[in-house]
Protein backbone atom coordinates (compact mmCIF):
# COMPACT_ATOMS: atom_id res chain seq x y z
CA UNK A 1 0.00 0.00 0.00
CA UNK A 2 1.29 3.43 -0.92
CA UNK A 3 1.22 6.32 1.53
CA UNK A 4 1.86 9.97 0.80
CA UNK A 5 1.67 13.14 2.83
CA UNK A 6 -2.09 13.52 2.48
CA UNK A 7 -2.93 10.21 4.17
CA UNK A 8 -4.52 11.73 7.30
CA UNK A 9 -8.22 11.00 6.90
CA UNK A 10 -8.46 8.66 9.87
CA UNK A 11 -7.35 11.47 12.19
CA UNK A 12 -10.42 13.46 11.13
CA UNK A 13 -12.57 10.97 13.05
CA UNK A 14 -13.10 12.47 16.50
CA UNK A 15 -15.64 12.47 19.29
CA UNK A 16 -17.01 15.78 18.02
CA UNK A 17 -18.04 14.44 14.64
CA UNK A 18 -21.70 13.99 13.72
CA UNK A 19 -23.39 10.68 13.02
CA UNK A 20 -23.93 11.72 9.39
CA UNK A 21 -20.23 12.50 8.96
CA UNK A 22 -19.31 9.06 10.27
CA UNK A 23 -21.98 7.45 8.09
CA UNK A 24 -20.52 9.12 5.00
CA UNK A 25 -17.11 7.65 5.81
CA UNK A 26 -18.58 4.18 6.33
CA UNK A 27 -20.56 4.38 3.08
CA UNK A 28 -17.31 4.93 1.20
CA UNK A 29 -16.24 1.46 2.30
CA UNK A 30 -13.32 -0.04 4.16
CA UNK A 31 -9.90 1.24 3.26
CA UNK A 32 -6.37 0.80 4.44
CA UNK A 33 -7.16 3.18 7.32
CA UNK A 34 -10.82 2.25 7.98
CA UNK A 35 -12.01 -1.10 9.40
CA UNK A 36 -15.67 -1.86 10.18
CA UNK A 37 -16.80 -4.66 12.51
CA UNK A 38 -20.25 -5.87 13.56
CA UNK A 39 -19.67 -6.22 17.32
CA UNK A 40 -23.27 -6.50 18.49
CA UNK A 41 -22.84 -7.39 22.15
CA UNK A 42 -19.09 -7.68 22.70
CA UNK A 43 -15.68 -6.69 21.43
CA UNK A 44 -14.65 -9.06 18.59
CA UNK A 45 -11.23 -10.65 18.99
CA UNK A 46 -10.34 -9.41 15.52
CA UNK A 47 -10.34 -5.86 16.92
CA UNK A 48 -6.92 -6.54 18.41
CA UNK A 49 -5.57 -7.74 15.07
CA UNK A 50 -6.67 -4.43 13.55
CA UNK A 51 -5.21 -2.55 16.51
CA UNK A 52 -1.85 -4.22 15.88
CA UNK A 53 -2.13 -3.73 12.11
CA UNK A 54 -2.89 -0.03 12.31
CA UNK A 55 -0.22 0.64 14.95
CA UNK A 56 2.46 -1.08 12.86
CA UNK A 57 1.48 0.52 9.54
CA UNK A 58 0.03 4.01 9.19
CA UNK A 59 -2.68 4.21 11.80
CA UNK A 60 -6.42 4.09 11.23
CA UNK A 61 -9.87 3.73 12.77
CA UNK A 62 -11.91 0.73 13.85
CA UNK A 63 -15.67 1.32 13.74
CA UNK A 64 -17.78 -1.09 15.80
CA UNK A 65 -21.46 -1.68 15.10
CA UNK A 66 -21.30 -2.05 11.31
CA UNK A 67 -22.38 -5.26 9.57
CA UNK A 68 -20.83 -6.16 6.23
CA UNK A 69 -22.89 -7.85 3.53
CA UNK A 70 -20.17 -9.24 1.28
CA UNK A 71 -22.67 -10.08 -1.45
CA UNK A 72 -23.16 -6.39 -2.17
CA UNK A 73 -20.55 -4.59 -4.27
CA UNK A 74 -21.69 -1.02 -3.61
CA UNK A 75 -20.11 0.15 -0.31
CA UNK A 76 -23.25 2.17 0.49
CA UNK A 77 -25.24 -1.09 0.47
CA UNK A 78 -22.47 -3.38 1.66
CA UNK A 79 -22.01 -1.77 5.08
CA UNK A 80 -25.10 -1.65 7.31
CA UNK A 81 -25.22 0.45 10.47
CA UNK A 82 -26.54 -1.90 13.18
CA UNK A 83 -25.05 -0.27 16.26
CA UNK A 84 -23.89 -1.88 19.50
CA UNK A 85 -26.21 -2.85 22.34
CA UNK A 86 -24.22 -1.58 25.33
CA UNK A 87 -21.53 0.89 24.23
CA UNK A 88 -20.50 1.79 27.77
CA UNK A 89 -19.71 -1.80 28.70
CA UNK A 90 -18.05 -2.44 25.34
CA UNK A 91 -15.71 0.51 25.80
CA UNK A 92 -14.93 -0.56 29.37
CA UNK A 93 -14.20 -4.14 28.26
CA UNK A 94 -11.95 -2.88 25.49
CA UNK A 95 -9.92 -0.71 27.86
CA UNK A 96 -9.58 -3.54 30.38
CA UNK A 97 -8.31 -5.86 27.65
CA UNK A 98 -5.97 -3.42 25.92
CA UNK A 99 -4.41 -2.42 29.25
CA UNK A 100 -4.07 -6.04 30.31
CA UNK A 101 -1.95 -8.79 28.78
CA UNK A 102 -3.76 -9.12 25.47
CA UNK A 103 -1.26 -6.90 23.65
CA UNK A 104 2.30 -5.97 24.47
CA UNK A 105 1.66 -2.23 24.71
CA UNK A 106 -1.26 0.20 24.87
CA UNK A 107 -0.68 3.30 22.75
CA UNK A 108 -4.16 4.83 23.04
CA UNK A 109 -5.35 7.89 24.93
CA UNK A 110 -8.81 8.33 26.42
CA UNK A 111 -9.93 10.50 23.51
CA UNK A 112 -9.03 7.75 21.02
CA UNK A 113 -12.07 5.65 21.99
CA UNK A 114 -15.50 7.25 21.74
CA UNK A 115 -19.08 6.69 20.65
CA UNK A 116 -21.11 8.39 17.95
CA UNK A 117 -24.88 7.97 18.16
CA UNK A 118 -28.19 8.94 16.62
CA UNK A 119 -31.61 7.92 17.93
CA UNK A 120 -31.36 4.21 18.71
CA UNK A 121 -28.09 3.49 16.86
CA UNK A 122 -24.73 3.87 18.59
CA UNK A 123 -21.37 3.19 16.98
CA UNK A 124 -18.05 2.90 18.82
CA UNK A 125 -14.92 4.29 17.19
CA UNK A 126 -11.37 3.26 18.14
CA UNK A 127 -8.76 5.57 16.67
CA UNK A 128 -5.32 3.92 16.47
CA UNK A 129 -2.28 6.08 15.67
CA UNK A 130 0.86 4.77 14.04
CA UNK A 131 3.14 3.78 16.88
CA UNK A 132 6.58 5.26 17.44
CA UNK A 133 9.31 3.22 15.73
CA UNK A 134 11.10 2.95 19.08
CA UNK A 135 8.17 0.91 20.38
CA UNK A 136 7.16 -1.24 17.40
CA UNK A 137 6.17 -3.97 16.82
CA UNK A 138 2.80 -3.86 18.55
CA UNK A 139 1.58 -7.43 18.82
CA UNK A 140 -0.98 -9.76 20.38
CA UNK A 141 0.17 -12.16 23.10
CA UNK A 142 3.79 -12.72 24.02
CA UNK A 143 5.31 -13.74 20.67
CA UNK A 144 5.93 -10.95 18.14
CA UNK A 145 6.45 -13.46 15.32
CA UNK A 146 2.96 -14.87 15.83
CA UNK A 147 1.05 -11.83 17.02
CA UNK A 148 2.30 -8.96 14.86
CA UNK A 149 -0.07 -7.69 12.18
CA UNK A 150 0.20 -5.10 9.43
CA UNK A 151 -2.38 -3.47 7.24
CA UNK A 152 -3.13 -3.22 3.51
CA UNK A 153 -6.19 -2.58 1.36
CA UNK A 154 -7.41 -6.13 1.93
CA UNK A 155 -7.35 -5.74 5.71
CA UNK A 156 -5.07 -7.06 8.43
CA UNK A 157 -2.40 -9.66 7.73
CA UNK A 158 0.28 -11.45 9.71
CA UNK A 159 3.58 -9.62 9.38
CA UNK A 160 6.39 -11.68 7.89
CA UNK A 161 9.44 -12.56 9.95
CA UNK A 162 11.45 -10.09 7.85
CA UNK A 163 8.98 -7.33 8.70
CA UNK A 164 9.06 -8.16 12.41
CA UNK A 165 12.86 -8.32 12.39
CA UNK A 166 12.93 -4.94 10.66
CA UNK A 167 10.74 -3.34 13.33
CA UNK A 168 12.89 -4.82 16.09
CA UNK A 169 16.07 -3.57 14.40
CA UNK A 170 14.65 -0.07 14.06
CA UNK A 171 14.38 0.13 17.85
CA UNK A 172 18.16 -0.09 18.12
CA UNK A 173 19.47 3.47 18.67
CA UNK A 174 22.87 2.44 17.26
CA UNK A 175 21.46 1.48 13.87
CA UNK A 176 22.10 -1.61 11.76
CA UNK A 177 25.46 -1.15 10.12
CA UNK A 178 27.69 -1.62 13.17
CA UNK A 179 26.89 -5.34 13.12
CA UNK A 180 30.06 -7.45 13.07
CA UNK A 181 29.99 -9.92 10.18
CA UNK A 182 31.61 -13.11 11.41
CA UNK A 183 34.34 -14.61 9.22
CA UNK A 184 34.66 -11.44 7.10
CA UNK A 185 38.12 -9.91 7.33
CA UNK A 186 40.26 -7.21 5.72
CA UNK A 187 40.85 -9.66 2.88
CA UNK A 188 37.25 -9.00 1.83
CA UNK A 189 37.91 -5.28 1.32
CA UNK A 190 38.44 -4.07 -2.24
CA UNK A 191 41.75 -2.24 -1.99
CA UNK A 192 41.10 -0.01 -5.00
CA UNK A 193 37.78 1.22 -3.60
CA UNK A 194 39.32 1.97 -0.22
CA UNK A 195 42.30 3.67 -1.86
CA UNK A 196 40.00 5.91 -3.88
CA UNK A 197 38.05 6.79 -0.75
CA UNK A 198 41.20 7.59 1.22
CA UNK A 199 42.48 9.84 -1.56
CA UNK A 200 39.28 11.89 -1.41
CA UNK A 201 39.47 11.87 2.38
CA UNK A 202 43.04 13.20 2.36
CA UNK A 203 42.19 16.00 -0.06
CA UNK A 204 39.27 17.14 2.09
CA UNK A 205 41.02 16.51 5.42
CA UNK A 206 44.64 17.31 4.62
CA UNK A 207 46.05 17.30 8.15
CA UNK A 208 43.75 14.72 9.68
CA UNK A 209 45.47 12.26 12.03
CA UNK A 210 43.62 9.34 10.41
CA UNK A 211 45.62 9.83 7.21
CA UNK A 212 48.62 8.15 8.87
CA UNK A 213 46.70 5.04 9.92
CA UNK A 214 46.87 1.68 8.19
CA UNK A 215 43.72 0.52 6.42
CA UNK A 216 42.40 -1.58 9.29
CA UNK A 217 42.85 1.19 11.86
CA UNK A 218 41.36 3.68 9.42
CA UNK A 219 38.25 1.53 8.99
CA UNK A 220 38.00 1.11 12.76
CA UNK A 221 37.79 4.88 13.14
CA UNK A 222 35.01 5.03 10.55
CA UNK A 223 33.04 2.12 12.01
CA UNK A 224 33.91 -0.24 9.18
CA UNK A 225 35.82 -2.68 11.40
CA UNK A 226 35.02 -3.43 15.01
CA UNK A 227 36.03 -5.54 18.01
CA UNK A 228 33.35 -6.63 20.46
CA UNK A 229 34.78 -5.94 23.92
CA UNK A 230 32.46 -8.44 25.56
CA UNK A 231 33.50 -11.58 23.73
CA UNK A 232 36.56 -10.53 21.72
CA UNK A 233 34.95 -11.09 18.32
CA UNK A 234 36.25 -8.83 15.60
CA UNK A 235 35.73 -8.33 11.91
CA UNK A 236 34.28 -6.14 9.23
CA UNK A 237 31.02 -4.47 10.07
CA UNK A 238 28.08 -4.35 7.73
CA UNK A 239 29.06 -0.77 6.90
CA UNK A 240 32.64 -1.73 6.11
CA UNK A 241 31.75 -4.60 3.79
CA UNK A 242 28.89 -2.89 1.97
CA UNK A 243 30.75 0.37 1.43
CA UNK A 244 34.22 -0.93 0.53
CA UNK A 245 33.96 -4.69 0.08
CA UNK A 246 34.71 -6.92 -2.86
CA UNK A 247 31.70 -7.87 -4.92
CA UNK A 248 31.76 -11.62 -4.25
CA UNK A 249 31.73 -11.41 -0.43
CA UNK A 250 28.95 -8.82 -0.64
CA UNK A 251 26.88 -11.04 -2.92
CA UNK A 252 27.55 -13.99 -0.62
CA UNK A 253 26.37 -12.25 2.55
CA UNK A 254 23.78 -9.95 0.96
CA UNK A 255 22.33 -11.98 -1.88
CA UNK A 256 19.16 -9.92 -1.47
CA UNK A 257 20.92 -6.67 -2.48
CA UNK A 258 20.41 -5.24 -5.95
CA UNK A 259 21.77 -1.87 -7.15
CA UNK A 260 20.32 -0.33 -10.27
CA UNK A 261 20.68 3.02 -12.02
CA UNK A 262 18.71 3.68 -15.20
CA UNK A 263 18.68 6.71 -17.43
CA UNK A 264 15.40 7.02 -19.30
CA UNK A 265 16.14 10.41 -20.81
CA UNK A 266 16.12 9.21 -24.42
CA UNK A 267 13.77 6.26 -24.83
CA UNK A 268 11.72 4.77 -27.65
CA UNK A 269 9.18 2.00 -27.98
CA UNK A 270 12.05 -0.46 -28.42
CA UNK A 271 14.56 1.00 -25.95
CA UNK A 272 13.45 1.30 -22.34
CA UNK A 273 16.60 3.08 -21.14
CA UNK A 274 19.57 4.78 -22.74
CA UNK A 275 22.14 4.13 -20.00
CA UNK A 276 22.34 1.75 -17.09
CA UNK A 277 24.62 0.81 -14.22
CA UNK A 278 24.02 -2.46 -12.44
CA UNK A 279 26.19 -5.43 -11.57
CA UNK A 280 27.73 -6.93 -14.71
CA UNK A 281 31.00 -8.42 -13.45
CA UNK A 282 33.17 -5.48 -14.55
CA UNK A 283 33.25 -3.63 -11.21
CA UNK A 284 33.22 -4.46 -7.51
CA UNK A 285 29.61 -3.79 -6.63
CA UNK A 286 30.00 -2.06 -3.28
CA UNK A 287 28.06 1.03 -2.27
CA UNK A 288 30.90 3.52 -2.60
CA UNK A 289 31.64 2.37 -6.15
CA UNK A 290 27.94 2.56 -6.99
CA UNK A 291 27.78 6.08 -5.58
CA UNK A 292 30.86 7.34 -7.42
CA UNK A 293 29.92 5.69 -10.74
CA UNK A 294 26.31 6.88 -10.74
CA UNK A 295 26.66 10.43 -9.40
CA UNK A 296 28.49 11.94 -12.42
CA UNK A 297 26.03 10.35 -14.86
CA UNK A 298 23.07 11.43 -12.79
CA UNK A 299 24.20 15.07 -12.65
CA UNK A 300 25.73 15.30 -16.13
CA UNK A 301 22.87 17.13 -17.87
CA UNK A 302 22.13 19.69 -15.17
CA UNK A 303 22.94 23.30 -15.95
CA UNK A 304 26.19 24.62 -14.46
CA UNK A 305 26.30 28.42 -14.55
CA UNK A 306 29.82 29.85 -14.46
CA UNK A 307 30.52 31.45 -11.07
CA UNK A 308 33.61 32.43 -9.12
CA UNK A 309 34.28 32.44 -5.40
CA UNK A 310 37.47 34.44 -5.23
CA UNK A 311 39.65 32.78 -7.84
CA UNK A 312 37.96 29.38 -7.51
CA UNK A 313 35.36 28.32 -10.06
CA UNK A 314 32.07 27.09 -8.60
CA UNK A 315 30.55 24.77 -11.17
CA UNK A 316 27.61 23.24 -9.35
CA UNK A 317 24.31 24.56 -8.07
CA UNK A 318 22.06 23.89 -5.11
CA UNK A 319 20.12 21.49 -7.35
CA UNK A 320 23.24 19.34 -7.77
CA UNK A 321 23.54 19.31 -3.99
CA UNK A 322 19.88 18.35 -3.47
CA UNK A 323 20.01 15.43 -5.90
CA UNK A 324 23.24 14.16 -4.40
CA UNK A 325 21.68 14.53 -0.94
CA UNK A 326 18.75 12.37 -2.07
CA UNK A 327 21.25 9.71 -3.19
CA UNK A 328 22.99 9.82 0.20
CA UNK A 329 19.65 9.59 2.02
CA UNK A 330 18.76 6.52 -0.02
CA UNK A 331 21.96 4.77 1.10
CA UNK A 332 21.94 5.71 4.78
CA UNK A 333 18.23 5.03 5.41
CA UNK A 334 18.04 1.72 3.51
CA UNK A 335 17.33 -1.53 5.35
CA UNK A 336 19.85 -3.92 3.80
CA UNK A 337 18.61 -6.86 5.88
CA UNK A 338 15.15 -7.04 4.30
CA UNK A 339 14.36 -10.07 2.14
CA UNK A 340 14.52 -7.84 -0.94
CA UNK A 341 16.94 -4.91 -0.78
CA UNK A 342 16.66 -2.91 -4.00
CA UNK A 343 18.50 0.39 -4.40
CA UNK A 344 17.12 1.96 -7.55
CA UNK A 345 17.56 5.32 -9.26
CA UNK A 346 15.62 6.32 -12.36
CA UNK A 347 16.61 9.47 -14.24
CA UNK A 348 14.11 11.01 -16.66
CA UNK A 349 14.16 14.27 -18.62
CA UNK A 350 12.35 16.13 -15.86
CA UNK A 351 12.66 13.98 -12.75
CA UNK A 352 14.80 11.76 -10.54
CA UNK A 353 13.39 8.84 -8.58
CA UNK A 354 15.19 7.18 -5.65
CA UNK A 355 13.97 3.91 -4.10
CA UNK A 356 15.42 2.12 -1.08
CA UNK A 357 14.38 -0.90 0.99
CA UNK A 358 12.75 -0.44 4.39
CA UNK A 359 9.75 1.53 5.59
CA UNK A 360 9.92 4.99 7.12
CA UNK A 361 10.53 5.27 10.84
CA UNK A 362 8.32 8.37 11.08
CA UNK A 363 4.93 9.17 9.53
CA UNK A 364 5.32 10.93 6.21
CA UNK A 365 3.52 14.09 7.34
CA UNK A 366 5.95 14.41 10.27
CA UNK A 367 8.89 14.18 7.87
CA UNK A 368 7.49 16.98 5.72
CA UNK A 369 7.09 19.09 8.85
CA UNK A 370 10.78 18.70 9.59
CA UNK A 371 10.81 15.70 11.92
CA UNK A 372 13.79 13.40 11.66
CA UNK A 373 14.96 10.06 12.97
CA UNK A 374 18.38 8.52 13.16
CA UNK A 375 19.50 6.82 9.99
CA UNK A 376 19.57 3.05 9.91
CA UNK A 377 23.21 3.19 8.88
CA UNK A 378 25.01 5.89 10.92
CA UNK A 379 28.49 4.54 10.08
CA UNK A 380 27.78 4.77 6.35
CA UNK A 381 26.50 8.27 7.00
CA UNK A 382 29.81 9.16 8.68
CA UNK A 383 31.82 7.60 5.84
CA UNK A 384 30.03 9.71 3.24
CA UNK A 385 29.99 12.87 5.33
CA UNK A 386 33.74 12.71 5.95
CA UNK A 387 34.35 13.00 2.20
CA UNK A 388 31.83 15.78 1.68
CA UNK A 389 28.62 13.93 0.86
CA UNK A 390 25.52 14.43 2.97
CA UNK A 391 24.32 17.13 5.33
CA UNK A 392 24.28 16.94 9.09
CA UNK A 393 21.87 14.49 10.67
CA UNK A 394 18.25 15.42 10.07
CA UNK A 395 18.85 18.30 7.66
CA UNK A 396 18.94 16.41 4.37
CA UNK A 397 15.25 16.24 3.44
CA UNK A 398 14.40 19.78 4.64
CA UNK A 399 17.29 21.03 2.48
CA UNK A 400 15.87 19.25 -0.57
CA UNK A 401 12.42 20.73 0.07
CA UNK A 402 13.88 24.22 0.42
CA UNK A 403 15.91 23.97 -2.79
CA UNK A 404 12.93 22.67 -4.78
CA UNK A 405 10.79 25.46 -3.35
CA UNK A 406 13.41 28.08 -4.28
CA UNK A 407 13.26 26.84 -7.88
CA UNK A 408 9.47 26.96 -7.96
CA UNK A 409 9.16 23.25 -8.71
CA UNK A 410 6.50 20.78 -7.66
CA UNK A 411 6.89 19.58 -4.08
CA UNK A 412 9.11 16.46 -3.84
CA UNK A 413 6.95 13.38 -3.45
CA UNK A 414 7.86 10.92 -0.70
CA UNK A 415 6.04 7.59 -0.95
CA UNK A 416 6.01 4.60 1.39
CA UNK A 417 4.99 1.15 0.19
CA UNK A 418 4.36 -0.94 3.31
CA UNK A 419 3.75 -4.14 1.35
CA UNK A 420 6.95 -4.07 -0.69
CA UNK A 421 8.68 -2.46 2.31
CA UNK A 422 10.31 0.30 0.34
CA UNK A 423 10.42 4.09 0.18
CA UNK A 424 10.55 6.22 -2.97
CA UNK A 425 11.45 9.89 -3.31
CA UNK A 426 10.54 11.54 -6.60
CA UNK A 427 12.08 14.90 -7.45
CA UNK A 428 10.18 16.47 -10.35
CA UNK A 429 11.63 19.52 -12.08
CA UNK A 430 8.30 20.87 -13.29
CA UNK A 431 7.23 24.33 -12.18
CA UNK A 432 4.22 24.84 -9.99
CA UNK A 433 3.00 27.31 -12.63
CA UNK A 434 2.88 24.49 -15.18
CA UNK A 435 1.00 22.31 -12.73
CA UNK A 436 -1.51 25.07 -12.05
CA UNK A 437 -1.86 25.83 -15.76
CA UNK A 438 -2.69 22.22 -16.49
CA UNK A 439 -5.04 22.05 -13.52
CA UNK A 440 -6.96 25.11 -14.74
CA UNK A 441 -7.19 23.88 -18.30
CA UNK A 442 -10.68 23.16 -19.62
CA UNK A 443 -9.87 19.79 -21.14
CA UNK A 444 -13.13 19.60 -23.10
CA UNK A 445 -12.67 22.93 -24.91
CA UNK A 446 -8.91 23.33 -25.09
CA UNK A 447 -7.61 19.78 -25.38
CA UNK A 448 -6.05 20.45 -28.77
CA UNK A 449 -4.13 23.47 -27.47
CA UNK A 450 -2.16 21.45 -24.96
CA UNK A 451 1.03 20.26 -26.59
CA UNK A 452 2.51 16.82 -26.07
CA UNK A 453 5.50 18.34 -24.30
CA UNK A 454 3.21 19.76 -21.65
CA UNK A 455 1.59 16.41 -20.97
CA UNK A 456 4.59 15.56 -18.85
CA UNK A 457 2.93 17.44 -15.98
CA UNK A 458 -0.08 15.12 -15.87
CA UNK A 459 1.56 12.61 -13.54
CA UNK A 460 2.31 15.21 -10.87
CA UNK A 461 -1.04 17.00 -10.89
CA UNK A 462 -2.77 14.78 -8.36
CA UNK A 463 0.29 14.55 -6.15
CA UNK A 464 0.78 18.32 -6.14
CA UNK A 465 -2.88 19.05 -5.45
CA UNK A 466 -2.94 16.59 -2.55
CA UNK A 467 0.11 18.24 -1.04
CA UNK A 468 -1.25 21.74 -1.61
CA UNK A 469 -4.56 20.84 0.03
CA UNK A 470 -2.72 19.58 3.08
CA UNK A 471 -0.66 22.75 3.27
CA UNK A 472 -3.87 24.78 3.37
CA UNK A 473 -4.98 22.75 6.38
CA UNK A 474 -1.52 22.78 7.94
CA UNK A 475 0.25 26.07 7.15
CA UNK A 476 3.02 25.35 9.65
CA UNK A 477 4.54 22.68 7.45
CA UNK A 478 6.68 24.40 5.97
CA UNK A 479 29.53 -1.72 -16.29
CA UNK A 480 28.00 1.19 -17.91
CA UNK A 481 25.74 -0.62 -20.34
CA UNK A 482 23.67 0.46 -23.32
CA UNK A 483 20.27 -0.91 -24.26
CA UNK A 484 20.63 -4.48 -23.06
CA UNK A 485 17.78 -6.71 -21.87
CA UNK A 486 16.34 -5.49 -18.59
CA UNK A 487 16.85 -7.77 -15.60
CA UNK A 488 14.72 -5.98 -13.04
CA UNK A 489 14.23 -7.85 -9.77
CA UNK A 490 10.61 -6.77 -9.51
Regions found by a protein language model. Give the residues of each.
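Asp/Glu-rich intrinsically disordered low-complexity tracts
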Residues: 436-444, 454, 461-480, 484-490
